[in-house]
Amino acid sequence: MAGGVDGPIGIPFPDHSSDILSGLNEQRTQGLLCDVVILVEGREFPTHRSVLAACSQYFKKLFTSGAVVDQQNVYEIDFVSAEALTALMDFAYTATLTVSTANVGDILSAARLLEIPAVSHVCADLLDRQILAADAGADAGQLDLVDQIDQRNLLRAKEYLEFFQSNPMNSLPPAAAAAAASFPWSAFGASDDDLDATKEAVAAAVAAVAAGDCNGLDFYGPGPPAERPPTGDGDEGDSNPGLWPERDEDAPTGGLFPPPVAPPAATQNGHYGRGGEEEAASLSEAAPEPGDSPGFLSGAAEGEDGDGPDVDGLAASTLLQQMMSSVGRAGAAAGDSDEESRADDKGVMDYYLKYFSGAHDGDVYPAWSQKVEKKIRAKAFQKCPICEKVIQGAGKLPRHIRTHTGEKPYECNICKVRFTRQDKLKVHMRKHTGEKPYLCQQCGAAFAHNYDLKNHMRVHTGLRPYQCDSCCKTFVRSDHLHRHLKKDGCNGVPSRRGRKPRVRGGAPDPSPGATATPGAPAQPSSPDARRNGQEKHFKDEDEDEDVASPDGLGRLNVAGAGGGGDSGGGPGAATDGNFTAGLA
């Protein structure tokens, strides 16, 4: 081959994924680079968030919920057993599930609670088929107790997840935070009275937030000024100007968490992106315009013009806090007839929706959420601006437009023939390289195109899928049927005897209707019969057959040899030409 094909080449490594998983499992067993600890029944399970989130939908929602999910490093759960969690951890890191009759029930329950469908389906199948049978001696009372435990564990799992999804303690005033802190979720297995007290504390915290007692800036503790993230004015050390709000010295203090040290690539929602000045510039451009922002709480900072607050520099947690306050005011004033106030609240909600669904998507949402968007894009419909034809599939519209413009961007390096599609060029290159990748498994014949192999296989199978609706004649290939209908013409009379092999160099077989007189010259054929015979002479062997005359008393036989003139009569004079059998 004279030259290589332009463009990137994808080289797969089949063992890469298993090697990566093996390396992660080695890190887990040695306690290296683990960023979260799961505490169950007093046992600690150091692990990686990303691995658990990739296997379990429950852990994915747990690790991505709340404003400070990155600061939560220990999760204590009591709705699964330590033995079941050990088996699920091994499955996540080794792609192998180890079950026994003793623990298959616990593993099934844990897999359902943690939303691991692959494991739950396998365990359920093992129990249904009695491959791993449960305890057959269990009575009805024990089964009811197991069901009650499962229902209780399901309720606890939901409440545990809802707590971190709402995460009210992260934005409480100091008094409410102190009250709620006395009921940590680390004591999740406490009595029902403790759980009720925790719910009351959470409800009081939400009520305080809705009443506007929290301005959203208490999320960060006071801390020394040196520990605060720089709010710089464009200095070199300020890698993210405008991302952190300037703290008012008179603002309330005593937040739950110490002020985080600003990372080089911290984004407005607390996650980490590319970092640097380019990231800050992109975030500043993507944020909504200050003029579009509505009025906020009295605790918000005023803008430069004094007409409205400047919220573009606030963190996402602060904006979310203010949105919750606006929702609380909207609920309190539901019976108010002042349309102007309701319009202001609607403007607040519109602004927040615009902010959180803005151009931050590429940095906020992880790759797993973009897969769904990619699938939707692949099924999208696009209309051609030239012929208005609807094209299904993303990326196919430019290829269709080339049929209008005549553009052929793909050129053969050898013969300089150009093509509109790259796959057509790839097939064309087989003419130069002699490559025939399609091999017949029965006779070993090789072909350059898959459709040639498909047609060849019908020689072995005897399949003739294309049939004429008028004469019921069948064909191996569709182009043969089209030629039969267009070029040859179909008389609509079905054949009585079916197919007949081509006669090569000999006299045609005598038919019952033939009345040629021995020794007499053959009657010259009519022009129509001569033309029909010449066309049939060049037809493929599998397409030749006798065509009955309309009255069924005579037949037209076509002999081989290429002569076009008439020959002498007699029994042995049928070596050249076309002969017409006489009609009785």
From Swiss-Prot:
List every stretch annotated Mediates interaction with SMAD4. Answer: 377-584
Q: Which Pfam families match?
A: BTB (PF00651), zf-C2H2 (PF00096)
Q: Where are the zinc fingers (C2H2-type)?
A: 382-404, 410-432, 438-460, 466-490
Taxonomy, superkingdom = Eukaryota
Query: What outcome follows a substitution of residue 184 to S?
Result: Decreased transcription repressor activity. No effect on nuclear localization
What effect is documented for mutating residue 486 to R? No effect on sumoylation with SUMO1. No effect on promoter binding. No effect on nuclear localization
Question: What's the protein name?
Answer: Zinc finger and BTB domain-containing protein 7A
Q: Which organism is it from?
A: Homo sapiens
